[in-house]
Amino acid sequence: MDPRGILKAFPKRKKIHADASSKVLAKIPRKEEGEEAEEWLSSLRAHVVRTGIGRARAELFEKQIVQHGGQLCPVQGPGVTHIVVDEGMDYERALRLLRLPRLPPGAQLVKSAWLSLCLQERRLVDVAGFSIFIPSKYLDQSQPSKAEQDASLPPGTHEALLQTALPPPPSPTRPVSPPQKTKEAPNTQAQPISDDEASDGEETQVSAADLEALISGHYPASLEGDCDPSPAPVVLDKWVCAQPSSQKATNHNLHITEKLEVLAKAYSVQGDKWRALGYAKAINALKSFHKPVTSYQEACSIPGIGKRMAEKIIEILESGHLRKLDHISESVPVLELFSNIWGAGTKTAQMWYQQGFRSLEDIRSQASLTTQQAIGLKHYNDFLERMPREEATEIEQTVQKAAQAFNSGLLCVACGSYRRGKATCGDVDVLITHPDGRSHRGIFSRLLDSLRQQGFLTDDLVSQEENGQQQKYLGVCRLPGPGWRHRRLDIIVVPYSEFACALLYFTGSAHFNRSMRALAKTKGMSLSEHALSTAVVRNTHGCKMGPGRVLPTPTEKDVFRLLGLPYREPAERDW
């Protein structure tokens, strides 16, 4: 992940969490001068738990509650009606954070999405679908019945609560890693790293804006600006895609980041993506800092590092160790072992762990595997070992020779880390097209049959994946002769009109690509592996309402030029 982009991505300023809930807050009409505020929350006596929600967003919630007639109460204050918590909170953690043995009488534990919907609808909506179930033993003995609660509500509130319940708005997601090739099993949580769930403080409060910054290398504009159809001027020096990867900063804090990366990995394999992202943010901020960190105050001054994380940094500086590493669950190395099986992600690894499996032999002999997972397990060690560049060259030439046996004009290019000039590669992606725009048709199946007959392709993971006019094969290959390992190979056949954008996409790096796509979006454009389009209309949520107009891009240089970027050679895109 890009250290330089992260530093640019997190300016030292207060920021609003740009998820569905915070967008709702941004859309609340501002009160005009002289206009009396509507008090449609007059029956609400709320307490907002900031953990997970974040200070800035919680303050916005509290301001809106008061502005619209509601009251803010201490959690044990008389008459508190709603305790608002983060979406991912369960009742056990909520009570632990509140330091209460049971819920106060008359109070309901609700997700923050409920309050967001109330603000969006400008009314008190039903909590159905938003309330968090609490076993009766955690309810105060004096907790009134539902009928008693209804009877105590002010006039008009009962009717408001009886209105049809709306489903909670979907939580926005932005992938940190590529999607799994196979369907994941239901999520079952493994043992957490430690019982001290509140110990991470600020670094766990990662906003969707932070996520956007991580993947684009640019801190998003304010939420109010998201609705402006006119693209804002772009400062290119803040974008990863505008800079050569050779400008990556020297890591002056390696002794710190190494230990934090262990924790980040532990959270990641346990499926705690937001906490893992919080650590990634801090790690990259440290990597890009211009000097070794020497004090707590200096650590706090770095954008992307909060007080809790600064405490961990100082602990490492003073003792050379981080005590939290001593409490990493024994499940972590097992989960990492399992998640390295091709076709098995975090959720599947957690499911296997919960079923009692502890080794690859357990998986091999007892687990129910998909076809892809069985292949991934069979070639586990081969897939994990990166291949030397010379082997990737041999694989590219084998595919090229087989393809050009059908048509000598076919272009075959190995992409990915190979094209970026890396000394080793994890897999090989070969892109195939023909300059006449026609002769690539029909080559896909014939090429695969030929490579199978040669014994070059040994296993099929995904025989054919249609993506518009592009066809993609995911499989396993092995070069002829003794001593060669099984390697992951993807073959993608594309029309020539899409070749430049596909070449850019499959060359990567993934971080560089995400930065380019985010930049295109700010310009009212859209970039994908198929095309670069302009005049793209999006709604207020950023979703495309139409395809726009496709721009001609004969070469990669045209894509850079149309985006107003200096051209970067593949070796300069290795962010």
Swiss-Prot record:
Its EC number is 2.7.7.7, 4.2.99.-. Residues 420-429 are annotated as: Involved in primer binding. The keyword Lyase applies. GO terms for molecular function: 5'-deoxyribose-5-phosphate lyase activity; DNA binding; DNA-directed DNA polymerase activity; metal ion binding. This is DNA polymerase lambda. Keywords: DNA damage, DNA repair, DNA replication, DNA synthesis, DNA-binding, DNA-directed DNA polymerase, Lyase, Manganese, Metal-binding, Nucleotidyltransferase, Nucleus, Transferase. The active site is at 312 (schiff-base intermediate with dna). InterPro entries: BRCT_dom, BRCT_dom_sf, DNA-dir_DNA_pol_X, DNA_pol-X_BS, DNA_pol_b-like_N, DNA_pol_B_palm_palm, DNA_pol_lambd_fingers_domain, DNA_pol_lamdba_lyase_dom_sf. It catalyses: DNA(n) + a 2'-deoxyribonucleoside 5'-triphosphate = DNA(n+1) + diphosphate. Belongs to the DNA polymerase type-X family. DNA polymerase that functions in several pathways of DNA repair. Involved in base excision repair (BER) responsible for repair of lesions that give rise to abasic (AP) sites in DNA. Also contributes to DNA double-strand break repair by non-homologous end joining and homologous recombination. Has both template-dependent and template-independent (terminal transferase) DNA polymerase activities. Also has a 5'-deoxyribose-5-phosphate lyase (dRP lyase) activity. Residues 36-132 form the BRCT domain. It is found in: Nucleus. Its cofactor is Mn(2+). Interacts with PCNA. Interacts with PAXX; promoting POLL recruitment to double-strand breaks (DSBs) and stimulation of the end-filling activity of POLL. Interacts with XRCC4; promoting POLL recruitment to double-strand breaks (DSBs) and stimulation of the end-filling activity of POLL. Interacts with NHEJ1/XLF; promoting POLL recruitment to double-strand breaks (DSBs) and stimulation of the end-filling activity of POLL. It holds the Pfam family DNA_pol_lambd_f. Residues 166-178 have a biased composition (Pro residues). The gene is POLL. It comes from Macaca fascicularis. SUPFAM superfamilies: BRCT domain, DNA polymerase beta, N-terminal domain-like, Nucleotidyltransferase, PsbU/PolX domain-like.
